[in-house]
Amino acid sequence: MLILTRRVGETLIIEDNITVTVLGVKGNQVRIGINAPKEVAVHREEIYNRIQADKKDERNERNDKYEKKYQNEDACDK
């Protein structure tokens, strides 16, 4: 992990097209602004984890449907 120190108003640049700017510090909270292309997904960690969990649930539901479908077809063939 790269660790950097920035002050309010200072910016980090990631590759050529993403900037992260420190907008403010208040107690133990830091406000940041992120400029990134539309095709780059930017999420808070808890939101990202929820999205991944939802995707996993959707995959499991699809797998369950396929398994039930093929089990029913196998039962009909007997």
Swiss-Prot record:
It comes from Hamiltonella defensa subsp. Acyrthosiphon pisum (strain 5AT). NCBIfam families: csrA, PRK01712.1. Homodimer; the beta-strands of each monomer intercalate to form a hydrophobic core, while the alpha-helices form wings that extend away from the core. InterPro entries: CsrA, CsrA_sf. Keywords: Activator, Cytoplasm, Repressor, RNA-binding, Translation regulation. Signal peptide: none annotated. It is found in: Cytoplasm. The lineage of its organism: Bacteria, Pseudomonadati, Pseudomonadota, Gammaproteobacteria, Enterobacterales. One of its GO terms (cellular component) is cytosol. PANTHER family: CARBON STORAGE REGULATOR. This is Translational regulator CsrA. The keyword Repressor applies.
